[in-house]
């Protein structure tokens, strides 16, 4: 049911007839936090903390290489403690269901060195200065925490999605796929050409009623170019839903329910009753990943 004590979203008058606004996610946060470990990457240039999940500690063989899924969180999320694992869209990938979908995968959640200054301005969030240090962290993780990895996939939420583009643009021959969620920073054509030359797979996700960026002005003009890529799946839903089937509203001083497409992506593009949110993906995001990985 609608919670009438909540502020009405700016898009409330545009929702389809018969639809309702949902003010809460329906999944449990923290159920899989215990499966992650936290470590510190001690680097002279930029030390960072990170969370990780090791499939070989949870029933998968130690005698093979597994894919590495890297999750880049959105702005302020590094300040949320373990909850950042969920906000980055990584938590459910540690579940038995998701891990079995692609035969095991390492999960890595790097943390930007975020903080608030005396004027309450957020500092230390993802930007280009993190590109090389983050690449070094990833390589260090592979060398010290794994027995080798196969394909490398970068997920990103919001500002983390923009950072995922920056990482793959800087190291195109290193990464195999990226899944940016909620970023308007689609690279220019010559960069997308490099993605194609290196067989990089792109899953581009952006809600048409995103409160932070205009789909019509910033995304739609770039869709034809994305469609020309060798490996690009485009997911731009009319509405972002919570698990109860309601149109999602999140407001912590500013409405962002439609920007937080990460929640639908994290729950594998399915509602609680099993309804599939995109008929092209009957097995959700994990099904797309399984196909990409050749499983």
Regions found by a protein language model. Name each.
Residues 1-67, 157, 162, 222, ...:
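A domain-start/cap signature at the N-terminus of enzymes
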Residues 59-64, 118-158:
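Gly/Ser-rich "nucleophile elbow"/oxyanion-hole loop immediately N-terminal to the catalytic nucleophile
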Residues 68, 74-132:
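Active-site machinery of serine-nucleophile hydrolases
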Residues 86-98, 162, 184-194:
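Alpha-helical scaffolding within the catalytic cores
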Residues 103, 196-202:
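Short, proline-enriched alpha-helix->beta-strand connector loops that line the catalytic pocket
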Residues 161-172:
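Short glycine-enriched nucleophile-adjacent loop
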Residues 173-185:
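A conserved short beta-strand
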Residues 203-205, 209-217, 227-295:
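C-terminal catalytic histidine-bearing segment of alpha/beta-hydrolase fold enzymes
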């Amino acid at each position: 049911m609608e919670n009438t004590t909540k502020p009405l979203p700016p898009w409330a008058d545009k929702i389809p007839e018969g639809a309702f606004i949902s003010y809460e996610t329906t999944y449990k946060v923290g159920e899989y936090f215990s499966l992650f470990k936290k470590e510190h990457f001690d680097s002279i240039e930029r030390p960072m903390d990170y969370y990780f999940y090791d499939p070989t500690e949870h029933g998968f063989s130690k005698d093979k290489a597994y894919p590495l899924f890297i999750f880049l969180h959105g702005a302020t999320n590094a300040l949320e403690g373990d909850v950042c694992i969920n906000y980055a869209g990584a938590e459910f990938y540690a579940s038995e269901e998701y891990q079995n979908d692609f035969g095991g995968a390492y999960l890595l959640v790097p943390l930007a060195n975020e903080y608030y200054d005396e004027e309450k301005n957020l500092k230390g969030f993802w930007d280009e200065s993190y590109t090389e240090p983050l690449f070094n962290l990833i390589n260090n993780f592979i060398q010290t925490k794994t027995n080798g990895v196969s394909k490398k996939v970068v997920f990103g939420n919001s500002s983390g999605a923009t950072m995922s583009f920056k990482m793959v643009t800087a190291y195109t021959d290193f990464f195999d796929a990226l899944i940016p969620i909620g970023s308007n920073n689609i690279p220019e054509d010559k960069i997308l050409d490099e993605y194609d030359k290196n067989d990089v797979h792109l899953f581009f996700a952006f809600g048409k009623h995103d409160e932070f960026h205009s789909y019509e002005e910033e995304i739609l003009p770039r869709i034809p170019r994305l469609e020309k890529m060798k490996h690009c799946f485009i997911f731009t839903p009319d509405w972002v839903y919570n698990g109860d089937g309601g149109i999602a509203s999140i407001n912590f001083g500013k409405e962002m329910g439609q920007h937080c497409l990460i929640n639908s992506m994290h729950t594998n593009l399915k509602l609680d009753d099993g309804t599939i949110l995109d008929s092209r993906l009957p097995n959700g995001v994990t099904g797309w990943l399984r196909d990409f990985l050749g499983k």
